Amino acid sequence: MVCSPVLLGIVILSVFSGLSRADRAMPKLADRKLCADEECSHPISMAVALQDYVAPDCRFLTIYRGQVVYVFSKLKGRGRLFWGGSVQGDYYGDLAAHLGYFPSSIVREDLTLKPGKVDMKTDEWDFYCQ
């Protein structure tokens, strides 16, 4: 089978343009955040979702009512209504934990694990879509 250079070029461009759309920096929700440690690697608290929330884009988490949410950061300033965290997949791990943001109003914090007192700047990786 002979493939024309134009067709080959279109195929290559479509593959690479799809990758660039998936991996990209998104607009920052806030300039500062509160974390439990300097790396934001320790959860601040555990919370339970009070209602479903469907993620509007790749920066956010889709959360279902009753799910346990691990809160890793709390945005400050213009993004203060959003927290960052993760929800676990099912018990057997079919779904990997995914980090993202969600409205703080849809969860109830049930257990504080470590106070979120470390005030730090957000960076482009905090809002990067994979």
Swiss-Prot record:
Disulfide-bonded cysteines: C35-C40, C58-C129
Expressing tissues: Cartilage primordia and cartilage.
Molecular functions per Gene Ontology: growth factor activity
Record keywords: Disulfide bond, Growth factor, Secreted, SH3 domain, Signal
Factors inducing expression: Repressed by retinoic acid.
Signal peptide boundaries: 1-22
Stored Gene3D superfamilies: SH3 Domains
Location of the protein in the cell: Secreted
One BP term from GO: cell-matrix adhesion
Domain SH3 residues, every copy: 42-112
A single Gene Ontology CC term: extracellular region
Main location: secreted
Free-text description of this protein's post-translational modifications in UniProt: May possess two intramolecular disulfide bonds.
Stated family: Belongs to the MIA/OTOR family.
Biological role stated in the UniProt entry: May function during cartilage development and maintenance.
Quaternary state and interactors: Interacts with FASLG.
Protein name: Melanoma-derived growth regulatory protein
